[in-house]
Curated annotation (Swiss-Prot):
Cofactor annotation: Zn(2+)
Keyword annotations from UniProtKB, A to Z: ATP-binding, DNA-binding, Metal-binding, Nucleotide-binding, Repressor, Transcription, Transcription regulation, Zinc, Zinc-finger
Zn finger (unnamed) location: 3-34
InterPro entries: ATP-cone_dom, NrdR-like_N, RNR_NrdR-like
GO terms (BP aspect): negative regulation of DNA-templated transcription
HAMAP family cross-referenced by the UniProt entry: NrdR
Molecular function terms, GO-annotated: ATP binding; DNA binding; zinc ion binding
UniProt-recorded name of the protein: Transcriptional repressor NrdR
Residue span, ATP-cone domain: 49-139
The family this protein is said to belong to: Belongs to the NrdR family.
């Protein structure tokens, strides 16, 4: 690590500690040339898989798109923003855990439906009706019946 004061390359770590939930490491460093001390934070770089759309087009995973879709389904429902963020983080973890470089949108959609089913049944039905392209009332009824089982 370069010293931010004198740009020397030689620095040593004096102290390391986990920060917050343990996903970050705080390090105190000292320059071996000018003896100045400074703090750095390290975070693991987690790469999300690319998404394969139904028309075979591949695009980067878009967390904002995921959030917008979930929030649209959850509109005017009694679900906290913390619960939504936790669900989004869980979905992202599940996608990374596949170990795949690319995942189909079907997998992402199913993970969203699983998360919504746990958060709010009405939001789940809203999302499922669009995601599965319900054509009539019968399909709504069948999905609601599956929820009640």
């Amino acid at each position: 690590m370069h010293c931010p004061f004198c740009a020397a390359v030689d620095t040593k770590v004096i102290d390391s500690r986990l920060v917050g939930d343990g996903s970050q490491v705080r390090r105190r460093r000292q320059c071996l040339v000018c003896n100045e001390r400074f703090t750095t934070f390290e975070v693991a770089e987690l790469v999300m898989p690319r998404v394969i759309k139904s028309d075979e087009v591949r695009e980067p995973f878009n967390e904002d798109k995921l959030r917008r879709g979930m929030l649209k389904a959850l509109e005017k429902r009694p679900v906290s923003s913390d619960d939504v963020e936790n669900a989004i983080n869980h979905i992202k973890s599940q996608l990374r855990a596949t170990g795949e470089r690319e995942v189909p949108t079907k997998l992402v959609g199913n993970l969203v439906m699983d998360a919504l089913k746990k958060l709010d049944k009405v939001a789940y039905i809203r999302f499922a009706s669009v995601y599965r392209s319900f054509e009539d009332i019968r399909e709504f009824g069948e999905e609601i019946a599956r929820l009640q089982d």
